[in-house]
Structure formats: C-alpha cells, structure tokens
Amino acid sequence: MKNTSKEYDTVIAICRSLFINKMKDYGCAWRILRLPSLTDQIYIKAQRIRSLQENDVRKIDEDETGEFIGIINYSIMALIQLELGVADQPDLDVSKATELYDTKVKLTKDLMEAKNHDYGEAWRDMRVSSLTDLILQKLLRVKQIEDNKGKTLVSEGIDANYQDMINYSIFALILMDFGTKN
C-alpha cells in the first residue's frame, strides 16, 4: 500500500491551516448554521466541482481543489454541529474550535484506515469525477435524512455520510497530487 496516511495528513494540514486562519478572520460565525444550511453549502461546492469537470469553458479561473477543501472543512463543521448543537451566537474560540476539528479529523481518519484496509485502496483506481458523484450521492442521502428529522430505518446516520464526504474529498485531492505541488 502507498503511504495513504501521510498523504492524508498532508491534505488535512492544509485544510486545517485554512480553517484556523478563517476562524481568526471571522470567528466561529458558522456555529449559528443549522445542519441543512451546512449541507447546502457542501452541495453548492460539489455541484461546482461537477460543473468544472463537465465544462470546458470557465468564467472564473479556479480549479476544483478549493471546492474539495471547502467540502472537507464544511463537513467537519457539520460534525461539530452534530455534537454541540447549533449556537445562537458564536461561542468557540480558535483553540477550542481547533481541538474539536482535530477530534473529528482523527475519528474520520480512523474510519478511512479501517475501510482502506478492507477495500484495498480501491479509491486509487477511481476517477476524481466518480468521487465527485459519490459525494453528490451522499449529499442527497443526507438531505433525505434531514428531511426525515434524522431518523433512518436501516441506514447509517448523517455523521457517517459527512465522514465519507471528507474522505472522498481527501482521496480526490490526493489523486490530483494536491499537497505535493503546494
């Protein structure tokens, strides 16, 4: 197996740095967002990635990397919201938010390592566009679960879907050689 753990950590370090810098700029204003709002933000980013992948002409000179980073960070925020609930006002300082971020990343990385072992790193043979489609599918599932007030009969919950979106986004960035070029 390739050094997935190290590549994963490289991508997360870049995402984490951006998260911290945005916390310093804006505080934790995101704490007032309800889960459907975060899900919609992730959906916008995933749709933009799909558009960029399908269209030859771009009116804004950006690639998919920033959108995948956004999916990662918004998904981590959603996991934090699932744990803490929505706040009426920003209520976390940079240190506490970063601690929560790191906790969610560790749980998500542990999940990735377990699945990666069982699936034999099959994602390395996938196309980035397929990972985008899987993220969009997960988003549709999350929206349905949200519409069902969080209840599922036999399916995994919202948290597992957010974790999968984080991992798929990291896989996509690794496949795009992100982190090795930056």
Set out the residue ranges of the language-model regions.
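Intrinsically disordered, low-complexity regulatory regions
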Residues: 1-182
